[in-house]
Amino acid sequence: MRGMVSFAVWALFAALLSQQLFASVASVRFEDAKTYYLSPPSGSHGTPPSHTPPSSNCGSPPYDPSPSTPSHPSPPSHTPTPSTPSHTPTPHTPSHTPTPHTPPCNCGSPPSHPSTPSHPSTPSHPTPSHPPSGGYYSSPPPRTPVVVTPPSPIVDPGTPIIGGSPPTPIIDPGTPGTPFIPAPFPPITGTCDYWRNHPTLIWGLLGWWGTVGGAFGTVSIPSSIPGFDPHMNLLQALSNTRSDPIGALYREGTASWLNSMVNHKFPFTTPQVRDHFVAGLSSNKAATKQAHTFKLANEGRLKPRV
């Protein structure tokens, strides 16, 4: 019986001792939790330690050793309530910033996180405006295409050639025309009056007025025919006003000579007219007869030559 009492006392003592030890341990853990999880007092903003992501993460997100700060940590529900101390311990800020150690290369696996309280409330994480620039490689922005405008072609019109001799114009002589005749020739014959009134026909036929000596040859005895000069022109011979047989022979003989040149059907040829004219100068009787014959031919009353 005495042994039973002794065992109960020891058991009670052990229970009290273990409860005291557990309360001390819980108080220490609570102070530690307050040191790491309590929000900093208002007005004081400490600069968080800068963490340079190591190059050995192999593309994994950067490792942040500092735990997230919960908004209101609550003690575990299954932990017995410790005795409330008489005063609230003031958490002290560690004088030095813990240096995080570089975890080994995870090669794509997510980094390990420190243990958190068994049932903390989910802290709120603000969404960063800029993603971390650690091991992540964002896609580069699309490049703006460069449009190259092709150069405008330069057309050289060339230098005009100025100078030089102008080309020689080609003159087509064409078919030579008929000699100009101011008035129509008579159809068959023309009287002495007709030729006297159309002096341009004589000029168009001979190119000049002509002479009696050139038409009928040199007169053998010019002095025997008073008033007539062998150098007189044909228009003067047609216009003489003598009323004797020699004057009539000059008028009609000159008209016959012109008709024989323009009309191939005239009864006498040009040589025949010349011969008959010279023969008529032999005497007044011969001159009268030949002048009458030339007059009939000039008026078209003789048979035309075939």
UniProtKB/Swiss-Prot annotation:
Residues 1-23 form the signal peptide. The keyword Signal applies. Residues 40-156 are annotated as: Disordered. Residues 62-83, 139-154 have a biased composition (Pro residues). GO terms for cellular component: extracellular region. Confined to the shoot apical meristem (SAM) at the layer L1 in vegetative, infloresence and floral meristems, as well as in protoderm of organ primordia, including during embryogenesis. Also present in the tip of emerging lateral root primordia. Keywords: Signal. The keyword Signal applies. Residues 40-56, 84-99 have a biased composition (Low complexity). May be involved in the regulation of meristem growth. This is Protodermal factor 1. The gene is PDF1.
